[in-house]
Protein backbone atom coordinates (compact mmCIF):
# COMPACT_ATOMS: atom_id res chain seq x y z
CA UNK A 1 0.00 0.00 0.00
CA UNK A 2 1.23 3.51 -0.74
CA UNK A 3 2.41 5.69 2.11
CA UNK A 4 -1.08 7.07 2.56
CA UNK A 5 -2.59 7.25 6.02
CA UNK A 6 -4.71 4.17 6.68
CA UNK A 7 -8.32 5.01 7.58
CA UNK A 8 -10.36 1.82 7.18
CA UNK A 9 -14.03 2.51 6.57
CA UNK A 10 -16.27 1.00 9.23
CA UNK A 11 -19.24 -1.10 8.16
CA UNK A 12 -22.66 -1.60 9.71
CA UNK A 13 -24.26 -4.83 8.46
CA UNK A 14 -28.03 -4.54 7.85
CA UNK A 15 -28.85 -8.17 6.93
CA UNK A 16 -30.68 -8.78 10.23
CA UNK A 17 -32.84 -5.62 10.05
CA UNK A 18 -33.11 -3.16 7.18
CA UNK A 19 -32.13 -5.56 4.39
CA UNK A 20 -34.97 -8.00 5.06
CA UNK A 21 -37.32 -5.16 6.08
CA UNK A 22 -36.73 -3.54 2.68
CA UNK A 23 -37.00 -6.69 0.57
CA UNK A 24 -39.18 -9.27 2.32
CA UNK A 25 -41.43 -7.13 4.55
CA UNK A 26 -39.40 -7.85 7.72
CA UNK A 27 -40.24 -11.56 7.70
CA UNK A 28 -36.85 -13.07 8.62
CA UNK A 29 -37.33 -15.18 11.75
CA UNK A 30 -35.07 -15.49 14.78
CA UNK A 31 -34.64 -19.17 13.90
CA UNK A 32 -33.22 -18.15 10.51
CA UNK A 33 -30.82 -15.65 12.12
CA UNK A 34 -29.25 -17.61 14.97
CA UNK A 35 -27.28 -20.30 13.05
CA UNK A 36 -25.18 -17.65 11.24
CA UNK A 37 -24.53 -15.34 14.20
CA UNK A 38 -21.20 -16.99 15.05
CA UNK A 39 -19.79 -16.27 11.57
CA UNK A 40 -21.23 -12.73 11.45
CA UNK A 41 -19.53 -12.10 14.80
CA UNK A 42 -16.10 -12.93 13.31
CA UNK A 43 -16.27 -10.45 10.40
CA UNK A 44 -15.18 -7.33 12.28
CA UNK A 45 -18.23 -5.14 11.64
CA UNK A 46 -18.51 -1.78 13.40
CA UNK A 47 -22.02 -3.00 14.33
CA UNK A 48 -24.80 -5.31 13.20
CA UNK A 49 -28.18 -3.62 12.87
CA UNK A 50 -30.62 -6.24 14.12
CA UNK A 51 -33.55 -4.60 15.93
CA UNK A 52 -36.02 -1.73 15.86
CA UNK A 53 -37.65 -0.21 12.80
CA UNK A 54 -40.48 -2.49 11.68
CA UNK A 55 -38.96 -5.68 13.18
CA UNK A 56 -40.78 -5.18 16.48
CA UNK A 57 -44.25 -4.94 14.93
CA UNK A 58 -43.60 -7.69 12.35
CA UNK A 59 -42.20 -10.14 14.96
CA UNK A 60 -45.38 -9.88 17.01
CA UNK A 61 -47.95 -9.50 14.26
CA UNK A 62 -46.75 -11.97 11.64
CA UNK A 63 -44.15 -14.26 13.22
CA UNK A 64 -45.69 -14.68 16.71
CA UNK A 65 -42.27 -13.98 18.20
CA UNK A 66 -41.32 -11.90 21.23
CA UNK A 67 -38.96 -9.18 19.89
CA UNK A 68 -37.31 -8.88 23.32
CA UNK A 69 -36.54 -12.59 23.28
CA UNK A 70 -34.99 -12.20 19.81
CA UNK A 71 -32.76 -9.41 21.09
CA UNK A 72 -31.60 -11.44 24.09
CA UNK A 73 -30.77 -14.45 21.89
CA UNK A 74 -28.82 -12.28 19.44
CA UNK A 75 -26.96 -10.64 22.33
CA UNK A 76 -25.98 -14.06 23.66
CA UNK A 77 -24.62 -15.00 20.23
CA UNK A 78 -22.70 -11.82 19.38
CA UNK A 79 -19.71 -11.85 21.73
CA UNK A 80 -17.53 -9.31 19.89
CA UNK A 81 -19.87 -7.15 17.81
CA UNK A 82 -21.98 -4.15 18.79
CA UNK A 83 -25.72 -4.42 18.19
CA UNK A 84 -27.62 -1.51 16.70
CA UNK A 85 -31.30 -0.57 16.48
CA UNK A 86 -33.46 2.02 14.69
CA UNK A 87 -35.64 4.21 16.94
CA UNK A 88 -38.30 6.67 15.72
CA UNK A 89 -37.66 9.37 18.33
CA UNK A 90 -40.75 10.21 20.35
CA UNK A 91 -42.69 7.62 18.28
CA UNK A 92 -40.34 4.85 19.58
CA UNK A 93 -41.15 1.95 17.21
CA UNK A 94 -44.81 2.89 16.84
CA UNK A 95 -46.76 5.41 14.82
CA UNK A 96 -47.70 8.11 17.35
CA UNK A 97 -45.84 10.23 19.92
CA UNK A 98 -45.51 8.59 23.35
CA UNK A 99 -45.10 10.22 26.76
CA UNK A 100 -41.53 10.78 27.96
CA UNK A 101 -41.76 8.07 30.65
CA UNK A 102 -42.48 5.41 27.99
CA UNK A 103 -39.64 6.65 25.75
CA UNK A 104 -37.16 6.62 28.65
CA UNK A 105 -38.20 3.16 29.82
CA UNK A 106 -37.99 1.76 26.29
CA UNK A 107 -34.43 3.08 25.86
CA UNK A 108 -33.49 1.71 29.28
CA UNK A 109 -34.83 -1.77 28.47
CA UNK A 110 -33.30 -1.78 24.96
CA UNK A 111 -29.87 -1.12 26.46
CA UNK A 112 -30.40 -3.61 29.30
CA UNK A 113 -31.29 -6.36 26.82
CA UNK A 114 -28.20 -5.82 24.69
CA UNK A 115 -28.45 -2.83 22.34
CA UNK A 116 -25.21 -0.81 22.10
CA UNK A 117 -26.06 1.80 19.43
CA UNK A 118 -29.45 3.51 19.11
CA UNK A 119 -30.05 5.31 15.82
CA UNK A 120 -32.72 7.93 16.53
CA UNK A 121 -34.61 9.89 13.86
CA UNK A 122 -37.67 12.11 13.43
CA UNK A 123 -39.68 12.30 10.21
CA UNK A 124 -39.65 16.13 10.28
CA UNK A 125 -36.07 16.54 11.59
CA UNK A 126 -37.68 18.33 14.57
CA UNK A 127 -34.94 17.93 17.17
CA UNK A 128 -37.43 18.47 20.01
CA UNK A 129 -38.82 15.03 19.15
CA UNK A 130 -35.36 13.48 19.68
CA UNK A 131 -34.15 15.08 22.90
CA UNK A 132 -35.81 12.67 25.37
CA UNK A 133 -34.48 9.59 23.55
CA UNK A 134 -30.96 11.04 23.24
CA UNK A 135 -30.83 12.00 26.94
CA UNK A 136 -32.12 8.54 27.91
CA UNK A 137 -29.46 6.85 25.75
CA UNK A 138 -26.76 9.05 27.33
CA UNK A 139 -28.01 8.08 30.80
CA UNK A 140 -27.91 4.35 29.94
CA UNK A 141 -24.37 4.72 28.51
CA UNK A 142 -25.67 3.57 25.12
CA UNK A 143 -24.30 5.18 21.96
CA UNK A 144 -26.81 7.81 20.77
CA UNK A 145 -26.63 8.19 17.00
CA UNK A 146 -28.95 10.88 15.64
CA UNK A 147 -30.07 10.53 12.03
CA UNK A 148 -30.76 13.37 9.62
CA UNK A 149 -33.71 12.36 7.44
CA UNK A 150 -32.13 13.35 4.12
CA UNK A 151 -34.28 14.95 1.46
CA UNK A 152 -34.22 17.48 -1.37
CA UNK A 153 -35.98 20.83 -1.67
CA UNK A 154 -35.46 24.60 -1.49
CA UNK A 155 -35.13 24.56 2.30
CA UNK A 156 -32.54 21.79 2.44
CA UNK A 157 -29.35 23.70 1.70
CA UNK A 158 -25.85 22.77 2.88
CA UNK A 159 -26.30 25.44 5.56
CA UNK A 160 -29.47 23.69 6.76
CA UNK A 161 -27.62 20.37 7.14
CA UNK A 162 -24.53 21.83 8.83
CA UNK A 163 -26.66 23.89 11.23
CA UNK A 164 -28.78 20.91 12.28
CA UNK A 165 -25.67 18.71 12.59
CA UNK A 166 -24.07 21.21 14.98
CA UNK A 167 -27.25 21.31 17.07
CA UNK A 168 -27.32 17.50 17.15
CA UNK A 169 -23.72 17.39 18.38
CA UNK A 170 -24.55 19.97 21.07
CA UNK A 171 -27.59 17.91 22.09
CA UNK A 172 -25.34 15.07 23.22
CA UNK A 173 -25.28 12.76 20.19
CA UNK A 174 -22.28 10.42 19.93
CA UNK A 175 -22.45 10.24 16.13
CA UNK A 176 -24.55 11.45 13.19
CA UNK A 177 -26.17 9.38 10.45
CA UNK A 178 -27.13 10.78 7.05
CA UNK A 179 -30.28 8.68 6.57
CA UNK A 180 -31.05 8.66 2.85
CA UNK A 181 -34.13 6.45 2.94
CA UNK A 182 -35.14 7.19 -0.66
CA UNK A 183 -31.75 6.85 -2.38
CA UNK A 184 -31.78 10.53 -3.42
CA UNK A 185 -28.19 11.41 -2.44
CA UNK A 186 -26.11 11.60 -5.64
CA UNK A 187 -22.37 10.84 -5.61
CA UNK A 188 -21.09 14.40 -6.09
CA UNK A 189 -23.66 15.78 -3.64
CA UNK A 190 -22.39 13.21 -1.12
CA UNK A 191 -18.88 14.64 -1.50
CA UNK A 192 -20.21 18.15 -0.79
CA UNK A 193 -22.39 17.10 2.15
CA UNK A 194 -19.82 14.89 3.89
CA UNK A 195 -17.07 17.49 3.42
CA UNK A 196 -19.28 20.22 4.93
CA UNK A 197 -20.36 18.05 7.87
CA UNK A 198 -16.78 16.94 8.64
CA UNK A 199 -15.79 20.62 8.78
CA UNK A 200 -18.69 21.36 11.16
CA UNK A 201 -18.75 18.54 13.73
CA UNK A 202 -16.15 16.40 15.49
CA UNK A 203 -18.32 13.31 16.05
CA UNK A 204 -18.26 10.38 13.55
CA UNK A 205 -20.54 10.39 10.50
CA UNK A 206 -22.37 7.33 9.17
CA UNK A 207 -24.04 7.20 5.74
CA UNK A 208 -27.14 5.06 5.20
CA UNK A 209 -28.76 4.84 1.77
CA UNK A 210 -30.84 2.52 -0.41
CA UNK A 211 -30.08 1.20 -3.89
CA UNK A 212 -33.58 2.07 -5.17
CA UNK A 213 -32.37 4.71 -7.64
CA UNK A 214 -29.21 2.83 -8.69
CA UNK A 215 -26.57 5.29 -7.44
CA UNK A 216 -25.89 4.01 -3.91
CA UNK A 217 -22.52 2.25 -4.44
CA UNK A 218 -21.11 5.29 -6.26
CA UNK A 219 -22.46 7.52 -3.50
CA UNK A 220 -20.65 5.39 -0.89
CA UNK A 221 -17.39 5.56 -2.85
CA UNK A 222 -17.48 9.36 -3.03
CA UNK A 223 -18.61 9.70 0.60
CA UNK A 224 -15.78 7.49 1.88
CA UNK A 225 -13.23 9.44 -0.17
CA UNK A 226 -14.68 12.63 1.38
CA UNK A 227 -14.12 11.26 4.89
CA UNK A 228 -17.34 9.53 5.99
CA UNK A 229 -16.50 7.18 8.87
CA UNK A 230 -19.15 4.46 8.54
CA UNK A 231 -21.33 3.01 5.76
CA UNK A 232 -24.31 0.64 5.99
CA UNK A 233 -24.25 -2.42 3.72
CA UNK A 234 -26.14 -5.71 3.30
CA UNK A 235 -24.85 -9.19 2.53
CA UNK A 236 -25.32 -9.82 -1.21
CA UNK A 237 -28.34 -12.21 -1.10
CA UNK A 238 -30.43 -9.36 0.38
CA UNK A 239 -28.59 -6.39 -1.16
CA UNK A 240 -29.39 -3.92 -3.97
CA UNK A 241 -32.87 -2.90 -5.14
CA UNK A 242 -34.77 -1.47 -2.20
CA UNK A 243 -31.97 -2.57 0.16
CA UNK A 244 -28.35 -1.38 0.59
CA UNK A 245 -25.21 -1.91 -1.53
CA UNK A 246 -23.64 -5.35 -1.08
CA UNK A 247 -21.15 -5.77 1.76
CA UNK A 248 -18.77 -7.96 -0.28
CA UNK A 249 -18.71 -5.48 -3.19
CA UNK A 250 -17.88 -2.50 -0.96
CA UNK A 251 -15.21 -4.52 0.86
CA UNK A 252 -13.57 -5.41 -2.48
CA UNK A 253 -13.92 -1.82 -3.73
CA UNK A 254 -11.83 -0.47 -0.85
CA UNK A 255 -9.25 -3.29 -0.89
CA UNK A 256 -5.63 -2.07 -1.21
CA UNK A 257 -6.71 1.54 -0.60
CA UNK A 258 -6.37 3.56 2.61
CA UNK A 259 -10.00 2.61 3.34
CA UNK A 260 -9.39 -1.17 3.24
CA UNK A 261 -11.70 -2.89 5.76
CA UNK A 262 -9.44 -5.92 6.13
CA UNK A 263 -12.49 -8.21 6.03
CA UNK A 264 -12.05 -11.84 4.97
CA UNK A 265 -13.92 -12.43 1.68
CA UNK A 266 -13.88 -16.21 2.26
CA UNK A 267 -15.81 -15.71 5.51
CA UNK A 268 -18.22 -13.30 3.79
CA UNK A 269 -18.75 -15.88 1.04
CA UNK A 270 -19.72 -18.51 3.63
CA UNK A 271 -22.22 -16.07 5.17
CA UNK A 272 -23.70 -15.30 1.74
CA UNK A 273 -24.03 -19.06 1.08
CA UNK A 274 -26.11 -19.32 4.24
CA UNK A 275 -28.54 -16.53 3.28
CA UNK A 276 -28.94 -17.46 -0.40
CA UNK A 277 -31.44 -20.32 0.15
CA UNK A 278 -33.49 -18.02 2.42
CA UNK A 279 -33.58 -15.48 -0.42
CA UNK A 280 -34.51 -18.18 -2.97
CA UNK A 281 -37.30 -19.48 -0.74
CA UNK A 282 -38.68 -15.91 -0.42
CA UNK A 283 -38.62 -15.54 -4.22
CA UNK A 284 -40.39 -18.88 -4.73
CA UNK A 285 -43.12 -18.08 -2.19
CA UNK A 286 -43.70 -14.59 -3.59
CA UNK A 287 -42.55 -12.94 -0.36
CA UNK A 288 -39.69 -11.34 -2.29
CA UNK A 289 -41.14 -9.38 -5.21
CA UNK A 290 -38.64 -9.24 -8.12
CA UNK A 291 -39.57 -5.55 -8.50
CA UNK A 292 -37.78 -4.94 -5.19
CA UNK A 293 -34.51 -6.03 -6.81
CA UNK A 294 -34.41 -3.56 -9.70
CA UNK A 295 -33.67 0.13 -10.15
CA UNK A 296 -36.57 2.57 -10.04
CA UNK A 297 -35.45 5.67 -11.90
CA UNK A 298 -38.72 7.47 -11.08
CA UNK A 299 -37.33 7.83 -7.56
CA UNK A 300 -34.76 10.30 -8.88
CA UNK A 301 -37.01 11.98 -11.42
CA UNK A 302 -39.85 12.68 -8.96
CA UNK A 303 -37.87 12.65 -5.69
CA UNK A 304 -40.32 10.11 -4.30
CA UNK A 305 -39.11 7.08 -2.27
CA UNK A 306 -39.65 3.65 -3.85
CA UNK A 307 -42.03 2.49 -1.12
CA UNK A 308 -44.15 5.59 -1.66
CA UNK A 309 -44.32 4.94 -5.43
CA UNK A 310 -45.70 1.43 -4.90
CA UNK A 311 -48.12 2.78 -2.29
CA UNK A 312 -49.48 5.38 -4.75
CA UNK A 313 -49.84 2.72 -7.45
CA UNK A 314 -51.88 0.45 -5.19
CA UNK A 315 -54.10 3.33 -3.97
CA UNK A 316 -54.90 4.32 -7.57
CA UNK A 317 -55.48 0.69 -8.57
CA UNK A 318 -58.09 0.33 -5.80
CA UNK A 319 -59.89 3.38 -7.20
CA UNK A 320 -59.56 2.14 -10.82
CA UNK A 321 -57.65 5.33 -11.57
CA UNK A 322 -54.22 4.10 -12.73
CA UNK A 323 -54.39 6.60 -15.60
CA UNK A 324 -54.00 9.40 -13.01
CA UNK A 325 -50.55 8.16 -11.87
CA UNK A 326 -48.52 10.97 -13.43
CA UNK A 327 -51.05 13.61 -12.31
CA UNK A 328 -50.56 12.35 -8.75
CA UNK A 329 -46.75 12.35 -9.11
CA UNK A 330 -46.93 16.01 -10.15
CA UNK A 331 -49.29 16.79 -7.26
CA UNK A 332 -46.97 15.23 -4.63
CA UNK A 333 -44.38 18.07 -4.62
CA UNK A 334 -47.20 20.65 -4.48
CA UNK A 335 -48.77 19.00 -1.43
CA UNK A 336 -45.36 18.59 0.16
CA UNK A 337 -44.76 22.34 -0.28
CA UNK A 338 -48.19 23.17 1.19
CA UNK A 339 -47.36 21.05 4.25
CA UNK A 340 -44.05 22.78 4.99
CA UNK A 341 -41.79 20.64 2.75
CA UNK A 342 -41.22 17.69 5.12
CA UNK A 343 -38.79 14.86 4.29
CA UNK A 344 -40.72 11.97 2.73
CA UNK A 345 -40.26 9.22 5.31
CA UNK A 346 -42.73 7.31 7.51
CA UNK A 347 -45.26 8.72 8.33
CA UNK A 348 -44.96 11.98 6.34
CA UNK A 349 -44.57 10.13 3.01
CA UNK A 350 -47.90 8.33 3.52
CA UNK A 351 -49.64 11.57 4.55
CA UNK A 352 -48.42 13.58 1.55
CA UNK A 353 -49.05 10.71 -0.90
CA UNK A 354 -52.60 10.00 0.24
CA UNK A 355 -53.52 13.69 0.18
CA UNK A 356 -52.11 14.04 -3.35
CA UNK A 357 -54.29 11.10 -4.47
CA UNK A 358 -57.40 12.72 -2.94
CA UNK A 359 -56.61 16.09 -4.52
CA UNK A 360 -56.37 14.56 -8.01
CA UNK A 361 -59.31 12.16 -7.75
CA UNK A 362 -61.71 14.73 -6.24
CA UNK A 363 -60.93 17.22 -9.00
CA UNK A 364 -60.44 19.92 -6.36
CA UNK A 365 -57.46 20.41 -4.07
CA UNK A 366 -58.18 19.73 -0.37
CA UNK A 367 -61.89 19.12 -0.96
CA UNK A 368 -61.36 15.96 1.09
CA UNK A 369 -58.70 16.09 3.82
CA UNK A 370 -57.30 13.18 5.85
CA UNK A 371 -57.04 13.35 9.65
CA UNK A 372 -53.25 13.03 9.32
CA UNK A 373 -53.04 16.04 6.96
CA UNK A 374 -55.01 18.07 9.51
CA UNK A 375 -52.71 16.87 12.31
CA UNK A 376 -49.58 17.97 10.43
CA UNK A 377 -51.17 21.40 9.85
CA UNK A 378 -52.10 21.54 13.56
CA UNK A 379 -48.45 20.95 14.56
CA UNK A 380 -49.20 17.55 16.11
CA UNK A 381 -46.20 15.90 14.42
CA UNK A 382 -43.86 18.78 15.24
CA UNK A 383 -42.39 21.76 13.41
CA UNK A 384 -41.74 21.67 9.66
CA UNK A 385 -38.71 23.32 8.08
CA UNK A 386 -40.84 25.78 6.09
CA UNK A 387 -44.15 27.48 6.98
CA UNK A 388 -47.42 25.91 5.84
CA UNK A 389 -49.35 27.40 2.93
CA UNK A 390 -51.72 29.69 4.93
CA UNK A 391 -54.65 29.29 2.49
CA UNK A 392 -54.39 25.50 2.60
CA UNK A 393 -54.05 25.53 6.37
CA UNK A 394 -57.17 27.70 6.72
CA UNK A 395 -59.16 25.48 4.33
CA UNK A 396 -58.17 22.30 6.18
CA UNK A 397 -58.32 23.25 9.87
CA UNK A 398 -60.60 26.31 9.87
CA UNK A 399 -60.37 28.20 13.18
CA UNK A 400 -58.62 25.41 15.12
CA UNK A 401 -55.47 26.72 16.77
CA UNK A 402 -52.23 24.90 15.86
CA UNK A 403 -49.85 23.94 18.65
CA UNK A 404 -46.31 25.31 18.67
CA UNK A 405 -44.92 23.30 21.60
CA UNK A 406 -43.26 19.89 21.35
CA UNK A 407 -46.20 17.48 20.76
CA UNK A 408 -45.19 15.23 23.68
CA UNK A 409 -45.42 18.19 26.09
CA UNK A 410 -49.18 17.73 25.92
CA UNK A 411 -48.99 14.06 27.00
CA UNK A 412 -49.27 12.88 30.61
CA UNK A 413 -47.13 9.99 31.85
CA UNK A 414 -48.56 6.73 30.52
CA UNK A 415 -46.63 3.84 32.10
CA UNK A 416 -48.68 3.37 35.27
CA UNK A 417 -51.97 3.31 33.34
CA UNK A 418 -50.55 0.87 30.78
CA UNK A 419 -49.23 -1.43 33.53
CA UNK A 420 -52.74 -1.62 34.99
CA UNK A 421 -54.35 -2.45 31.65
CA UNK A 422 -52.16 -5.46 30.87
CA UNK A 423 -51.18 -6.69 34.35
CA UNK A 424 -52.80 -10.14 34.05
CA UNK A 425 -50.65 -11.00 31.02
CA UNK A 426 -47.34 -9.66 32.29
CA UNK A 427 -44.52 -12.20 32.33
CA UNK A 428 -41.56 -9.80 32.07
CA UNK A 429 -40.97 -6.06 32.63
CA UNK A 430 -40.71 -5.47 28.88
CA UNK A 431 -44.28 -6.65 28.22
CA UNK A 432 -45.71 -3.26 29.19
CA UNK A 433 -43.62 -1.63 26.44
CA UNK A 434 -44.82 -4.15 23.88
CA UNK A 435 -48.38 -3.34 24.94
CA UNK A 436 -47.71 0.42 24.85
CA UNK A 437 -46.68 0.30 21.20
CA UNK A 438 -49.24 -2.14 19.79
CA UNK A 439 -52.03 -2.80 22.34
CA UNK A 440 -54.22 -5.13 20.27
CA UNK A 441 -51.36 -6.99 18.59
CA UNK A 442 -49.63 -7.36 21.97
CA UNK A 443 -52.77 -8.79 23.62
CA UNK A 444 -53.14 -11.33 20.81
CA UNK A 445 -49.48 -12.29 21.24
CA UNK A 446 -49.73 -12.56 25.05
CA UNK A 447 -52.71 -14.92 24.67
CA UNK A 448 -50.84 -16.95 22.05
CA UNK A 449 -47.78 -17.14 24.36
CA UNK A 450 -49.98 -18.29 27.25
CA UNK A 451 -51.64 -20.92 25.07
CA UNK A 452 -48.24 -22.25 23.96
CA UNK A 453 -47.22 -22.75 27.59
CA UNK A 454 -50.48 -24.16 28.96
CA UNK A 455 -51.56 -25.85 25.72
CA UNK A 456 -54.93 -24.19 26.35
CA UNK A 457 -56.45 -22.16 23.55
CA UNK A 458 -58.27 -19.29 25.24
CA UNK A 459 -60.51 -18.83 22.19
CA UNK A 460 -61.80 -22.38 22.59
CA UNK A 461 -62.52 -21.97 26.29
CA UNK A 462 -66.06 -22.05 27.67
CA UNK A 463 -65.45 -19.02 29.87
CA UNK A 464 -69.02 -18.88 31.16
CA UNK A 465 -68.67 -22.26 32.87
CA UNK A 466 -64.93 -22.00 33.46
CA UNK A 467 -64.25 -25.00 31.23
CA UNK A 468 -61.18 -25.36 29.04
CA UNK A 469 -60.50 -27.90 26.29
CA UNK A 470 -57.77 -30.42 27.00
Feature map (PLM): residue ranges:
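N-terminal amphipathic alpha-helix/helix-capping segment at the start of soluble metabolic enzymes
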Residues: 1-24, 71, 76
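Conserved, mostly hydrophobic/aromatic
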Residues: 11, 19, 40, 120, ...
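Terminal or standalone catalytic/regulatory effector modules within metabolic enzymes
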Residues: 41-59, 289-299, 303-470
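Active-site beta->alpha loop and helix N-cap motifs at the rims of alpha/beta catalytic domains
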Residues: 47, 52-169, 176, 183-187
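Glycine-rich phosphate-binding active-site loops on the catalytic face of alpha/beta enzymes
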Residues: 120-123, 180, 226-243
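Catalytic cores of alpha/beta
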Residues: 156-168, 213-229
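C-terminal helical cap(s) of enzyme catalytic domains, especially alpha/beta-barrels
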Residues: 239-261
